[in-house]
Swiss-Prot record:
Gene: rpoZ
Listed EC numbers: 2.7.7.6
Protein's job: May be involved in RNA polymerase activity.
Cell location: Plastid, Chloroplast
One Gene Ontology term from the biological process aspect of the record: DNA-templated transcription
Organism whose genome encodes this protein: Cyanidium caldarium
Enzyme class: transferase
Protein name, UniProt field: Putative DNA-directed RNA polymerase subunit omega
UniProt family annotation: Belongs to the RNA polymerase subunit omega family.
């Protein structure tokens, strides 16, 4: 017979993993969409890849003005 404490513990861990997975997917999609906009806006004016620019801006490491300076 399955111990109910283990059963609830496993269910809790599964829920945690699903939430983390959904959060990572959401973040990945935000970065990808932002990178697509950045790529379209800057059209190969920079040696910095759009995904890296997106990560830096979303994380707060760079502001839009800084990115424009890098890509011009």
């Amino acid at each position: 017979m399955v111990d109910k404490r283990n059963h609830y513990f496993l269910l809790h861990k599964i829920e945690e993993l699903l939430e983390l997975s959904a959060s990572k997917y959401k973040t990945t999609m935000e970065i990808a969409n932002y990178a697509k906009k950045t790529k379209n806006r800057n059209a190969n004016k920079s040696n910095i890849k759009p995904v890296i620019l997106a990560i830096l801006e979303i994380s707060g490491e760079l502001k839009l003005n800084d990115i424009n300076k890098l890509t011009n």
